[in-house]
Structure formats: structure tokens, C-alpha cells
Amino acid sequence: MGAASGRRSPPLLLPLLLLLLPPPPVILELDPALQPGNFPADEAGAQIFAASFNSSAEQVLFQSTAASWAHDTNITEENARLQEEAALLSQEFSEAWGQKAKDLFDPVWQNFTDPTLLRIIGAVRTLGPANLDLEKRQKYNSLLSNMSRIYSTAKVCFPNKTAPCWSLDPELTNILASSRSYTLLLYAWEGWHNAAGIPLKPLYQDFTALSNEAYKQDGFSDTGAYWRSWYDSPTFTEDLERLYQQLEPLYLNLHAYVRRALHRRYGDRYINLRGPIPAHLLGNMWAQSWENIYDTVVPFPDKPNLDVTDVMVQKGWNATHMFRVAEEFFTSLGLLPMPPEFWAESMLEKPSDGREVVCHASAWDFYNRKDFRIKQCTRVTMDQLSTVHHEMGHVQYYLQYKGQHVSLRRGANPGFHEAIGDVLALSVSTPAHLHKIGLLDQVTNDTESDINYLLKMALEKIAFLPFGYLVDQWRWGVFSGRTPPSRYNYDWWYLRTKYQGICPPVVRNETHFDAGAKFHVPNVTPYIRYFVSFVLQFQFHEALCKEAGHQGPLHQCDIYQSTQAGAKLRALLQAGSSRPWQEVLKDMVGSDNLDARPLLSYFQPVTQWLEEQNQQNGEVLGWPEYQWRPPMPDNYPEGIDLVSDEDEARKFVEEYDRRSQVVWNEYAEANWNYSTDISTDNSKLLMEKNLQMANHTVKYGTWARKFDVTNFQNATMKRMIKKIQDLERAALPTKELEEYNQILLDMETVYSVASVCHENGTCLRLEPDLTNLMATSRNYQDLAWAWKSWRDKVGRSILPYFPKYVELTNKAARLNGYQDGGDSWRSMYEMPFLEEELEQLFQELQPLYLNLHAYVRRALHRHYGPDVINLEGPIPAHLLGNMWAQSWSNIYDLVAPFPSAPKMDATEAMIKQGWTPLRMFKEADNFFTSLGLLPMPPEFWNKSMLEKPTDGREVVCHASAWDFFNGKDFRIKQCTSVNMEDLVVAHHEMGHIQYFMQYKDLPVTFREGANPGFHEAIGDVLALSVSTPTHLHKINLLSSGDGGYEEDINFLMKMALEKIAFIPFSFLVDQWRWRVFDGSVTRENYNQEWWSLRLKYQGVCPPLARSQDDFDPGAKFHIPASVPYVRYFVSFVIQFQFHQALCQAAGHQGPLHKCDIYQSKEAGKLLADAMKLGFSQPWPEAMRLITGQSNMSAAAMMTYFKPLLDWLVTENGRHGEKLGWPQYNWTPNSARLEGPFVGSGRVNFLGLNLEEQQARVGQWVLLFLGVALLVATLGLTQRLFSIRHHSLRRPHRGPQFGSEVELRHS
């Protein structure tokens, strides 16, 4: 609010102590020519006295105002001193003339017949501060100067920094207006109230005492009584209360509506729907005007934006142009243009030369009838355009009444002066007028647009009413003594809560002086004038609109260019304060009372709308929980520079998503090219794209970290940004990132291109050679050679890289806020007790595994004999049909419960029928589409690698599904063999593709599984149906789909060899890695701890002695490829939960293991709905969509295998099997390891690879060494298999899904 005539303004900084202030000003004497003469003590003499006073007062007031202007536009000690000197001279003048008026006319002046003279003498005889003696007068002036300086130079500095420090205008004002960050707003609010308010309190106490002392000598009870006297009404305070009660319902409805909108943004933590609103959230430092949060509360956001700030900026408006536009409005009414002095001398922008100035907008009358100025740090905004009209309204008033006696150059009452500019602003802000001046393209006169406009006006006008009312309620209490200094702040907040329904956002006490943080308090500008003006301006507006011939709703009136309205306004302005304001008001509006009815009429449409909205929402009007206060934000104030504006966040994620699709697509293409053609060139390109991806991640992740999402009400936005904030490996410094990427590439390359060779030069690759050997051979020595050779070649080669990989993984994790790499990986599950819950699931499944283990061990004992199989010990790891003993389905022929029953392996039929890898994937596609799911797109068939190339290329054979992030390109890379096992794998991989396609329209951030296990489970769910004899019969791979009990047990055994056998391995791999990451497993015991866990959970042991020179974990793809593994454990549990739920949806009746959901659209819909969520919601929501509940459970898996478990328990009982491996330190007879390796012509003699002749001679020569070696081996084995107990660490955070998937080979 602008002050009239020479009022001071704002800025910010803690003041100097009074002891450091300059000495009191030099005592100056009033020019004798300005002293009053002698006049007759009658009415005629009073007329001469008034004329003489007028000419002298103009000179003194000009000098005083000029000194104040010089100070307020350049705050220096020298200018402060000159201002105080001018104030003393002005007070000396007032004392001389005021005392003369009292001496001459006090006995007679109230009987004067000239009412104008009566008003002049009454004004002159009021001395105010001039009543004080010189010493007190000097102190009074010094207090005013210092209070103004403290307020105007106060600054708020950024935490722990000396710069930048914020001034009130423009920095803090802009923050309060535009920021939506709860913590930044809080810091700005608290900082300003502390910086400006606290140092003012002792000065204000002293000012109050001196001011009261001065006005009591004029016959007033206190300063407040003097201020109220300007309104010439004995019932003034009662009239104000009556007006406020009339207007309060409108305010309460606005308050409730805005509180609800803020609740949507800030949530329950910071907004209580039955309590007051925290004062810093309303777009203004004092919560007096709320239009800056219009974007948060706009009723109909799709309608044209009525805040034309952006248009003003686009059109190049500047401060001068804004004032020219305002001037043109006045002149269009036939009123006066601004004089040359106005344009030459005004300060319309904040100076850029470093001067401290009082930025608070104010209009100045220099009392020489030609010099009128405005001081405003104007910003190009719509709000400031209204302020420009407001301030120019003051100047127009000065121009119109400049011919009046100097004592009457005031508004009819102070509210009149404040109302004039605002009356014009009511027209300026209408859409019709904004269109006329080129700031709005079109005017939309529909109900929704009207409600938008009126709500915007209500945020300015109605929101202000209680504040406009309470400020002087508080000051009148201070002046009267009802509010002593010990209760300054308490009473201030009592009134603000009582009338405004706001509360301080931080704890306040009597060390604070929050009233002093409002310009008008330290600058001693009475405030009730603004409340009065907000009522008057609508009375004026209604009268002027009528004069202008306006037809229609009052809020649509624009008096622009109406000279009739201008003439009526001119008559009011020219009267100044020469007549009672009631008379002037009656001439203007036809009534001599303040009346709220025009205001209520103006806002009637939005009042009705607010009432309806609040009733619909069940809003509580008022704040019954008035004592509620918001909690302090976590880690305040460290995070104040973070952005919490959801609109800004939305723009960020939109840009991130657009760019990510490009970057991720390029990376996927480079990765594909390398994986399908391992070459130096492709390696280099992949490294380049890897670095590009890292740079992208760093750029946007760093940007994302500038957002504080704590109070985001949009959960999706919050989730997205939190995910982007995790930079993963890209958090590493550039050199270390390059090193890390090279390590990963080197490790994966070692794994992918490795081959093992016989002495005769025959070399075997993992795919398909070693895999087939492990699957089909039953020769103990051949299997041992393949098992050991692979680990010698791959594991030992990877070991040198691994410690550095661990170090950099941990460093990246810690840079992202995690404890270590394992903590980071676990975070993807969003489960605070992930490890404990996984352990619980494992324990639930362990009985099934132990019975399967005992049964298989008995079968292997029958085949290999007691020398290498101990019925109470672990199973040698190379005998289970798989390089890692993770899936045992390849030894089904050795363990089949009923070998004479019909076989259910469709491999033979597939080969006979001429199936190809392409046919296998077409069949998988058919399964998905039969459920109503999406078919594979053309790009899939054109670009996938479904077979191992025959052109000599080195490829990564490990099956994987690929999303190229363009919404149409999805591929599978698989070295497919024609067998039933790979048919199942084809469905698994296509499950990933189906997932990709279902969530392809989500933001890139959410294009992954609900948790990593979900992605793995989807394809396997379908495989559970595909594997059933019923389904194999449907697709003509089995002659019959129905079997008896024996066939059922055989089928379940085959499934258990794949599913149950895998459970402990999938559980332990990351148990080992998590311990490596947390440091409890070090390089010195990598291998020992690996085998300790494999023994503990799987009950397997190495077939040969292992040492710390070996690195057997590295022989498993996911270790060098850095792919988290516990996802597979999770997927194996939840796939059975999904299967059970989908079978129920499909209407299946009977045992769960016989269910085939093929062609069930109902099951497909459940699956599709869950997949469409991607990662957009926590995984329990996706689980609930499919299963109806939100927890992982082993119950469905146990139900599926219940018939087999019953059979196993009976069978194991019949043979007296020991469950578990009590003789855990047993190892297979090493003598069985001697003998020829297949095709090599060489033998292994006590671990040495020798020619046969060398071995025979060496048997005798090295007998003693052999015995010693055997003893040493047994000792080492004892140490290897000692079971260690490690404390489980609590999970926290983790990585995102990688496209590599588990492949179980046949």
C-alpha cells in the first residue's frame, strides 16, 4: 500500500547499535521571516493568521519533504542527519505557529462561523511531536530515522554464506510471490521478521512513550485517539466493527477455499483443514494479499490466464511505460496529466548504482503546487501495474487540491486518499480493459471466466480486509497501554489468528517483534485508512460506473474514457479535507455512511460459488483448532535452496522424459550392436554412449536434486523425481566413471568370449558346448573337468577386476546417499525390512527344498556310488546338470520318480516336427495374444537375434530382452536351441517384452517392473501354463494332456528341479554380494565365503579343493555383469502367487499345477492392468491388482508343490533319509578325480595336468608329496566349509531393473 505525502518505505538489514549512530543533529533556528506575527484574537484575525501560515508552511514543508526524499532515495548517515535537522525545523515551525494559534484563538475558535477556517485552526493548533522539549524532540526524530533505516536496510542472508543477501524488494518479495517451496518460503519469512523486527522493538517502545506524551498535550488520550480523530466520528470504532462483521462471511468462505487448495499442495503435515493457515504460504510477506497464489487456487485453470504479467514482459513494457499507461487512464477521464517535475524527479525503478533506498511505493507532495513525485521500485508485473495506478491516484489527488490551504491538502479522510487509485485499478484489472490496452487477446464473458476473475480480485481485496482492520487494532492497544511491551508479539499474533485465521510458521516469542516487520509500523503510517479505503473504493466504483452509464454486473465495469465519471471524481478530489468527509461522500455516492453493500454486490457471484464449493467439500468455516501450529520441516534450513514448486517439477520431468528417450535409445542401440557383435569398434562406441548416458544422468539427476519433493501432493511426480535423483554410477567423477565402465566391459567381455581348451586344441564355449556337456554327461571326470576349467578360465580372470569394481560401486552408492552398493540395490524394493522378509520366505520354502535335496542326493548316490556321494553330506556341485547347480532339470532322467511313466519332455516332438527358434517365439507370441495381450510388433521380428549367429561373430549369448525406448522397438537376444527348456525361456523373455509394451506410454522413469522381481515373474507365469501337459497337448507337443498320479508326480518333480532347486541359489548370490559390498567379506575370503553360503543354503560343495586364488562367483554371468540377483528369488515366489490368482480369474478348477490360463481374457486383463503400472506405483499396488492382497507369500508355491512334497516326505521316510547335510565338511573322494580328461591324452594327478607316462613314474617318486598334498587339501577343505554367521544388515535403497534375465539351460 502506498503512503501519501512523503511517507517512508522498505528494504532490509540489522541496524547498527545506537551507540554507533551519529551524534544528535545540530540545533538550528527557524528563519525569523517564518515566525508568526501578531494577529487579532478574533475570526477576522484568524483568517489573516491562516493566510500567513499557508505561505510560510509551504516553504517549511518543501524543505522537510525534500530532505526526506533525499534520505529515502539514498540512505546515508549524512542524509539521515539532514533529514533530522529538517524535521527539527519543521517541528519548531509547528510549535511556533501552533502555540500562537492556541494563545490567540483557543478561547474563541470553536465559535467561528467559517467551517473551513475552523478546520484550518484545528489543524494548526495540533502540535504533536512539537509539544516535546528539544531533547525529546531530537530523540523522537532520531527514533523515526533509525526505525526507517533498520527496516529499509535489513537483509536476509543465505545460510552459512555472506552472499547473496536478499533485500525485501525485490528479492524477498519475489520469493514470497513465486516460490512454492515450503522451506524457502519459511526461511525468507523467518529471516525477514527476525532481521527487521527484532532490533526495532526497543526503539518502538521509546517511540510509543514519546508520541503519547506529545499528543496528550494536544488533548488526546494517546496517539491512537489522535489518529482516530481524523475520521470525525464518535462511533468510528463501532462502525468499523459493524463493517467487518458484514464482510467476515465472505472472508471465511475465501479462507476455507484457499486452505483446501493449499492442503492439496502441501498436505496434512503443513495444512490443518480446521486450523489457521501458516502465514508464509499466501504469496505475500504479511499474508495481506493472496493474488500471488492465484495459480494454486484458480477455479477453472483451462480458462484464459488473467495475470497478464507474461504478456507485459513479452511486449517489452518497462516501468516508465506502466506509469504512462496509468497517466493515460486519468487523462481519459478528463483529469490532469502528470506535470514535468513528476517525470523528471520521480524514482520509478530501484537504482542500479548501489544506493540503499526505501523501496516501499509512496507518493509525495512537495507543497509548492508543482512538484509531485512517486518513489517505487517498480517491477513489470500486473500486480505492480495496479500499484502504479494506486500511487498515481495519490498524485492526482495532490494535483486536484493543490489550491486548497496547506492544512486542507489531505484526503477527506485518510481512506479517501488510499481509495482513489484503487478505484481506477478496479477498471484497469477488468478483462475488457486489459483487452483495450493490448494485454489480453480476447474477452471471454462466461460464468467460469467471471468466477476466475472475481476470485483473483477477492485474493487481493477480500483477503486484505482482516489485515487492514487488525494492524491499527494492535497499535491502538499499544498506544493505550492495553498491550504492554511484554505482550507486543503475543497480542499481534492473537489478532492475526483471530481475524485472519493465520499462524506463525515457526515459534515466536517476546524476543520477536513481528509487527515491526511491516513497513507502516516502524514508519508510523496509520493503517486503518486501508480498511476504510477498501470499503470506500467500491462505493466510489459503483457511483462512477453509474455516471459512466455502465450496464451489467459491477465487476465488469470499466470507466475508462468516461469524462462524466471523471467530472464526478474531480469534484471529490478538489475538496481535499476542506469539508467533512461525510458530506463529500454524500455528494459522490448519495450516502454519508461507509457501506459494505457495493463491495458485497461486486463479489456476489464468487461469494455464491465459494459457498457452494465449501459445502460440497464439507469445509469448516473458520479455524476451531486455532492453537494448531505446523511442524518444522526436516533438516531446516539446509534445504531452503531446493525447489518445491510442482509446476516447475512437471516441466523438468517432461524435458527429462523427452531427452531420455533419445539418449537411452542411442545407448540401447550401441549396447545391442556390441552384444551381437563383440568387437573393438563396437566396444568403443558402447563406451561413448555409456559416457553420454552417464552425462545425461548426471545432468538431470543433479537438476532433480534441486527439488524438494517432501511435500509434493502429486505422488507420481514425487516418485519420478526421487528416482531421477539417484545418479547411480554416474555420480562418480568422470575419470572413475570411465574406469568403472571399462571394468564392467572388460569383465563381461572376459565372460562372453571365454572358451576352455583340451590339450589337443579342441576348445569349448559356454554356449552351447559346456552347457550341453554339463546337461547331458554323466561322466564324473568329464563334468569335473568342465566345471573346473570354466572357473579357472573365467573366475580367475575376473578376480583382478573385482575389488576395484566393488570399491567404485560402493563409492557411487554413497554419493547417492546409500550406505554401500548392496544398500543401493535393495532400495528398489521399497521395503525397510527386505532381508528379514526374504529370510522368512526362504524358511517357509526350506522344507520343500530339503526333501528335494535328500531325494536327489539318494538318486545320485545310486548312479555315482558312495565314493562321491555322501547321504549325509553336501552334493558335489558339478553333478546337478548345470554349471552352477542352480537348476537340476537336466538330471531328471536320473531322478524321475516313475521312469516308466510317459515322458513329458516335448523336446523330441519339437525336433520331429521341425520346430525352429522362430517357431518357438511365434508360439510364445500366440500364447500372449490368446490372453488379449499385445502381439509382438514388426520391429521385434525384424531385429531380434533369436539364434546364435553362424557368421563367426562373437556374441553375448545370455538371453535378454531389450527395450529401445521409442515405444515400438523391442527385441530379444537369445542363442536359442530347439528344446522344451528354451521354449520356456522364450516365454520368459517375451514376458519382458510384453511388460515393455504395456508400460511404453509411461514416462521413461517408470518403464520398468513394479520391482525387479516382477519383470522376471511375468514370463515365468505364462511358462507355468506352457509347461503343463494340458498345454503341450494343445500345441501338439504331447499326445495326451491328461495323466495319472505317476505322471503328475513326474511333472511336479521336473518343475521342482527347475523351481525349487533354484530357490537357495537365487537367495544366496546377493547374500554374498551384499556382504562383499558392506565389507564383511573381503578379497582375502571371497571364495571361502562364497562356498560357505552355497553349503549353508544349497547343500552343495566343490568337487575339487578351492583356494583364495580361485574366484568361483565370477564364473556366474551376473557377477561380472553386475546384475542384481535376488530379483530371481522374488520372482520365483511371486510367479506362483500370480499363477494362483490368474487361474482363479480363468475359472480353473482342480490342482494348481494343472492350470493352463491359455486363451483366458480375464486372466490377461489382470496381468495387463498390473503391467501398465510399470514402476509408477509401489509394487504392493501391482500385487494387489493381480492377487487382491499386497504381500509376498510362499503359500501359493507350497500349494502348487503340495502333492510332490507329500510324495517326497513319504519316499524319504521310506529310505530313512537325513534331511540336510549334517556331515557338512565332507568332500568327494579325490582318488576318483585321477584319470584321463576326455580327448586330451593327459591325466590329472593330484591336481597336476600330466602326460600318462609322467603320472606313472611320478606316482612312486611323489608318493610322499601326494600324501602330504592330500592332508593339506583336507585341511583347507575343513576351513573352506566352516559355516560363518553374519549379521543381517537392514535394507535401505537399491538399483533399477536391468534387462538381463536369468537363463536356465537344458
From Swiss-Prot:
The modification Phosphoserine is found at S1299. Chloride 1 binds at Y231, R529. GO terms for molecular function: bradykinin receptor binding; calmodulin binding; chloride ion binding; metallocarboxypeptidase activity; metallodipeptidase activity; metalloendopeptidase activity; metallopeptidase activity; mitogen-activated protein kinase binding. Zn(2+) 1 binds at H390, H394, E418. Residues 1278-1306 are cytoplasmic. Pfam families: Peptidase_M2 (PF01401). InterPro entries: Peptidase_M2. Zn(2+) 2 binds at H988, H992, E1016. Keywords: Calmodulin-binding, Carboxypeptidase, Cell membrane, Cytoplasm, Disulfide bond, Glycoprotein, Hydrolase, Membrane, Metal-binding, Metalloprotease, Phosphoprotein, Protease, Repeat, Secreted, Signal, Transmembrane, Transmembrane helix, Zinc. One of its GO terms (biological process) is negative regulation of gene expression. The active site is at E391 (proton acceptor 1), H520 (proton donor 1), E989 (proton acceptor 2), H1118 (proton donor 2). Disulfide bonds join C157-C165, C359-C377, C545-C557, C757-C763, C957-C975, C1143-C1155. It is found in: Cell membrane; Cytoplasm. Chloride 3 binds at Y829, R1127. This is Angiotensin-converting enzyme. It comes from Bos taurus.
